[in-house]
Amino acid sequence: MASFGPAPLFTNHVDLGSILSGKLATEKSPTAVSAYPIATGSSVFGIKYDGGVLLGADTLVSYGKMARYPNVPRLFQVNDTTVITCSGDYADFQHITSLVERMQIEEERTQNEVVMQPRSLHRYLTRYLYNLRSKFDPKWTNIVVAGLQDGEPFLGYISMIGLAFTEDAVTTGLGGAIALPLMRKMLDQNKGKLLTFEEATKIMEESLKLGFALDCVAYPKYQIANINKDGVQMGKPETVSLNWKYVKNFDATL
């Protein structure tokens, strides 16, 4: 039915009041969540040794470049054989850990004595992150999965786009340039054999020291998880005792 009355004076105009009130943006733009990481964690480090795996990460979650939350554990124990950690957006990591918890509860409820293994979790998270990336809705976090698979140490990496691999030494973020060369050099010197627990602990502590010294969003307080045949030993937070002479000679160690 035709409407009667005076025609509007202007037809194709932008209502300034709607722009200022946000009404126009709400009507014409889709609802969106943050597409960039906000509260983030820095590099994490993992290395195999003969009989187990060590994972290390500091306890800081940064808001941009501000050290906002200094006492946040970034090592998550899935069960007695598996631990995961991350660098990147911490909220996305919390979502992933809650997803893993629900999976674990469901498996325990429906299947008797079935324990989630690190390799199967690594494969599941690879497909999960790749699927989200394919939908252009990635999780802004890089995951490291460590544990014991059939009595053998397992260490795997998954990027935010679903790129995955397993290795004897794994780092994320700036740790790939700072500590990974040091780890690989020590593994090469061992001629293909895994390190002892003492050697792995030493290289892990050195990696955390270098991370704190050379990464502007790293933190001196860190935590190390040890996964072996006795289960998961989650270490208490410790503080880096940094010797700047060690950092000065960093290039000579590579």
Predicted regions and their residues:
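Long, low-complexity N-terminal extensions
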Residues: 1-254
